[in-house]
Amino acid sequence: METTTKLAIGVSALCCLASAAFAGGPDIPMIDMNGFHIGLGFGYKSYTYDQVGTVTVTTNGGTVLSVLHPVSASITQFGPVGELGYTFASDWWIAGVKAQYQYDNVRSVHIMDAPLVGSNYSYRTRLGSHLTAMLLAGIKVNEANAVYLEAGYSTVWGKTTLFGPGPVAVSMKNRLNGGIAGIGWRHYFMNNVFLDLSYDYALYRSKSNSVTLSSATASAEGTAIGVSGTVQNPKRVAINGITATVNYLFNI
């Protein structure tokens, strides 16, 4: 009961703060939203991607078995964000440009069984930091708040490493490019400090690329058996999430 009461009090307080931000209270002097800004914050992102690996078994040069290992992964990541941009504002609208860089280190490991020979391949996929550049346009809700829409270009860096049955590995790096769009809200605490909160969805695509790792064994009858593992880079990655930064505004 005590926990429920505290939660209710907290929710009520947040509602009061939100109401005060958009209406009521004393008049707030007009804030100059024009200028260059730079800020730091955090982002909570959800990564979704598809990837395919293949294990092939051959004897005497002929394929005996080829097994596909498709993977659909969904991973969340919390990481630091840097932001900079420039805003133009009138009495009732805002427009501008914004760039964000988020450091992420999304990792996933998948096992690929090699039938008939009892050995395994595995591959590790890493999706690293991503960079976005967007145009934005919106309206002022009041003297200290504005809502806007944004859209632009984004890129994310990745790396896939394929491990064989022995202490051998091969890797490939790739960069995925795509578009990003979202909605945001800015609250100005004072003339030079504001909170920038946004939700965005980004879709990335990349050219198909792959790496292969092969090994050979011999059966009891002396027949040579070859085993190879192949993995493709993620060709399609979707990222959606929330970003919050605190920025300092230079009215220049």
From Swiss-Prot:
The record lists the effect of residue 136 to I as: In strain: Kerns
Question: What GO molecular function annotation could you give as one example from this UniProt entry?
Answer: porin activity
Q: Which GO terms describe its biological process?
A: monoatomic ion transport
Cysteine pairs forming cystine bridges in this chain are none
**Record-annotated membrane-spanning stretches:** none
Topology relative to the lipid bilayer, per the entry, is: Multi-pass membrane protein
Q: Which UniProt keywords apply?
A: Cell outer membrane, Ion transport, Membrane, Pharmaceutical, Porin, Signal, Transmembrane, Transmembrane beta strand, Transport
Where in or outside the cell it occurs: the entry states: Cell outer membrane
Record's GO cellular component terms:
cell outer membrane; pore complex
* SUPFAM superfamilies (UniProt xref): OMPA-like (SSF56925)
Biotechnology (record note): Might be used for vaccine production.
Q: What is the effect of changing residue 78 to S?
A: In strain: Xinqiao
Q: What is the effect of changing residue 228 to L?
A: In strain: Kerns and Scurry
Query: Main subcellular localization, coarse class?
Result: membrane
**From which domain of life does this come?**
Bacteria
UniProt effect for mutating residue 79 to S: In strain: Kerns
Signal peptide (residue range)? 1-23
- Effect on the protein upon substituting residue 17 to F: In strain: Henzerling
Functional summary from the UniProt entry: Able to form a pore in lipid bilayers.
Q: Which family does it belong to?
A: Belongs to the Coxiella porin P1 (CPP1) (TC 1.B.43) family.
Q: How does this protein assemble?
A: May form trimers.
Q: What is this protein called?
A: Outer membrane protein P1
**The organism of origin for this protein:** Coxiella burnetii (strain RSA 493 / Nine Mile phase I)
